[in-house]
């Protein structure tokens, strides 16, 4: 393909623009809402697995703060 060809350059620019736009988080206005809903669900699931939010943890880094049990807070450990 000859890149000095104006239609080819325009096609490449259009594809690049579309790919960049599709990867941008700001393009979808529903993402903050989805994150809020799914984040609340993940927090509740984490609390259930870990015997409560921030339960029985030596420090904040060992808690279920990232929505998964750590080696210090998992049941059965």
UniProtKB/Swiss-Prot annotation:
Chief localisation class: secreted
Tissue spec: Expressed by the venom gland.
GO-annotated molecular function: ion channel regulator activity; toxin activity
Signal sequence annotation: 1-21
Residues cleaved off as propeptide: 22-49
Keywords assigned by UniProt, alphabetized: Disulfide bond, Ion channel impairing toxin, Knottin, Secreted, Signal, Toxin
Localization, UniProt: Secreted
Entry's family note: Belongs to the neurotoxin 10 (Hwtx-1) family. 65 (Jztx-21) subfamily.
Domain notes: The presence of a 'disulfide through disulfide knot' structurally defines this protein as a knottin. Is missing the last conserved cysteine.
Protein name, entry field: U14-theraphotoxin-Cg1c
Naturally occurring in which organism (per UniProt): Chilobrachys guangxiensis
């Amino acid at each position: 393909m000859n890149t000095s060809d104006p239609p080819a350059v325009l096609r490449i620019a259009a594809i690049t623009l579309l790919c960049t736009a599709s990867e941008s988080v700001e393009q979808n206005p529903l993402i903050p809402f989805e994150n809020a809903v799914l984040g609340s669900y993940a927090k509740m699931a984490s609390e259930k697995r870990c015997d409560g939010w921030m339960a029985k943890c030596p420090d904040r880094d060992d808690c279920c703060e990232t929505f998964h049990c750590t080696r210090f807070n998992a049941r059965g450990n």
